C-alpha cells in the first residue's frame, strides 16, 4: 500500500516515463481509481456503471489513451443534485486504508454539450498534503445493449484488479459512432474518432457486429437520431474531406503523443470498417 506522497510521486514519475504519459493525468487517474475502489465496496456497487474515457483507457492501456475525468451511468437511483450528493457522500466515506481523503466541492446539472442530462460532481482528494482535483459526470437511463458487464479493472500502480460494472465494448462504440454521425463536422471531440480507431485495433476481433448494430439503433432511439443514421456514409465522406476536421485532428495529434503518427484517413478508415462490418 502506498503510504506517502513521496512514494506516490516517485511511482507516478516512473510510470510517466515508461508510458510517455503526463504525470498530472496519471495522478488524477490514481485518485479516480481510489474512488472506483470505494464504489466497488459500497452499497451502491451494483448501481454504478463505468463508461467514457476512463473505461476506454483501461481497455487499451494508459500508453494508448489518457483521460482527466470519470464518467458513469447509474441505474436504480434518482439522478438529481440532492440524491447524488447523498450517494457520493456515502461512497467517499467507505473505509479503505489508503490515506486518501475526498472533499466534495460542488454538484451541478450538466448543461454543456451533453447528449443526455446528468450531474457533474467536483471533488478534491487529499493525500499526505497533495491536493488533486477530480470531476465525475453521472447520467442515467443510457441504452446499454444488451446489458452492462462485470469488468476487472486493473489498477495502475498495484498488481491487482477491482471488479466493477461497465459498458460492454459494443455500447462504447455505438455511443461514439452515433455522436460522429449526428454531429458530423460540428463534432470537435477528436477523442471519439481516436477511441473507435484504437478499440477497433485492439479489440476488433472480439467485437460482435450484430450487437453493435442493435446498440447503435438503441442509442439513436434514446437520443432521437434514428433518421440521421441513414446518412452515415455521406457523413463519413463529409467529415473526412472537411479541412476544419483535418485541422482539429492535427491539433489532437500534436497534443497526445499516442496519436502523433496516426493519419486522419487511417482513423476514418477504421470507422468505416467498423460501420461496414455492422451493416453487412
Protein language model features and the residues they cover:
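Structured mid-to-C-terminal alpha-helical surface segments
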Residues: 1-48, 57-66, 70-280
Amino acid at each position: 500500500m502506498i503510504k506517502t506522497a513521496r512514494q506516490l510521486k516517485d511511482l507516478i514519475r516512473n510510470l510517466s516515463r515508461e508510458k510517455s504519459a503526463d504525470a498530472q493525468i496519471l495522478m488524477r487517474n490514481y485518485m479516480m481509481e481510489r474512488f472506483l475502489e470505494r464504489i466497488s465496496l459500497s452499497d451502491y456497487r451494483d448501481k454504478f456503471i463505468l463508461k467514457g474515457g476512463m473505461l476506454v483507457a483501461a481497455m487499451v492501456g494508459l500508453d494508448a489513451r489518457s483521460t482527466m475525468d470519470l464518467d458513469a451511468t447509474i441505474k436504480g437511483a434518482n439522478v438529481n443534485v440532492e440524491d447524488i450528493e447523498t450517494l457520493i457522500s456515502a461512497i467517499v466515506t467507505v473505509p479503505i486504508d489508503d490515506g486518501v481523503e475526498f472533499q466534495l466541492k460542488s454538484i451541478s446539472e450538466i448543461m454543456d454539450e451533453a447528449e443526455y442530462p446528468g450531474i457533474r460532481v467536483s471533488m478534491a482528494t487529499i493525500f499526505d498534503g497533495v491536493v488533486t482535483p477530480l470531476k465525475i459526470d453521472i447520467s442515467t437511463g443510457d441504452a446499454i445493449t444488451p446489458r452492462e458487464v462485470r469488468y476487472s479493472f486493473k489498477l495502475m500502480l498495484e498488481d491487482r484488479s477491482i471488479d466493477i460494472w461497465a459498458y460492454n465494448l459494443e455500447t462504447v462504440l455505438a455511443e461514439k459512432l452515433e455522436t460522429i454521425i449526428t454531429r458530423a463536422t460540428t463534432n470537435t471531440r477528436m477523442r471519439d474518432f481516436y477511441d473507435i480507431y484504437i478499440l477497433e485495433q485492439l479489440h476488433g476481433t472480439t467485437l460482435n457486429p450484430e450487437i453493435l448494430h442493435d446498440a447503435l439503433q438503441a442509442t439513436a432511439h434514446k437520443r432521437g437520431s434514428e433518421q440521421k443514421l441513414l446518412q452515415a456514409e455521406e457523413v463519413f465522406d463529409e467529415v473526412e474531406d472537411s479541412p476544419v476536421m483535418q485541422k482539429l485532428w492535427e491539433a489532437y495529434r500534436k497534443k497526445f503523443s499516442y496519436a502523433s503518427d496516426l493519419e486522419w484517413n487511417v482513423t476514418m478508415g477504421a470507422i468505416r470498417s467498423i460501420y461496414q462490418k455492422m451493416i453487412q
